[in-house]
């Protein structure tokens, strides 16, 4: 899925994935008690940063990847009624493979 945001340099746009809404015992977790999601799907990737020697360093993630990111990293933006997070590639901790 492509969004109308084109990130610059080593930034990526992530759609946060909602965490489980109920506990294992079936209790529903209210919105006020939920943690910020730290997992999301990459929907756009910048071209990479330019190194001191002038070469472009590509970003390690691609569109469609599911990533884990820093809890308080990035900037929240709303586009077309959907919420996204613009992160630096350095805020991505891991790529999730299932």
Swiss-Prot record:
Keywords: Chaperone, Cytoplasm
UniProt keyword annotation of Chaperone present: yes
Domain of life: Bacteria
Entry GO terms, CC: cytoplasm
Gene3D superfamilies per record: GroES chaperonin
Pfam families referenced in this protein's UniProt entry, alphabetically: Cpn10 (PF00166)
Single GO biological process annotation from the record: chaperone cofactor-dependent protein refolding
PROSITE patterns in the cross-refs: CHAPERONINS_CPN10
Statement: the UniProt record of this protein carries the keyword Chaperone: yes
Database matches in SUPFAM superfamilies: GroES-like (SSF50129)
Subcellular localization: Cytoplasm
Subunit organization: Heptamer of 7 subunits arranged in a ring. Interacts with the chaperonin GroEL.
Family: Belongs to the GroES chaperonin family.
Role according to the record: Together with the chaperonin GroEL, plays an essential role in assisting protein folding. The GroEL-GroES system forms a nano-cage that allows encapsulation of the non-native substrate proteins and provides a physical environment optimized to promote and accelerate protein folding. GroES binds to the apical surface of the GroEL ring, thereby capping the opening of the GroEL channel.
Name of the protein: Co-chaperonin GroES
Species whose genome carries this gene: Micrococcus luteus (strain ATCC 4698 / DSM 20030 / JCM 1464 / CCM 169 / CCUG 5858 / IAM 1056 / NBRC 3333 / NCIMB 9278 / NCTC 2665 / VKM Ac-2230)
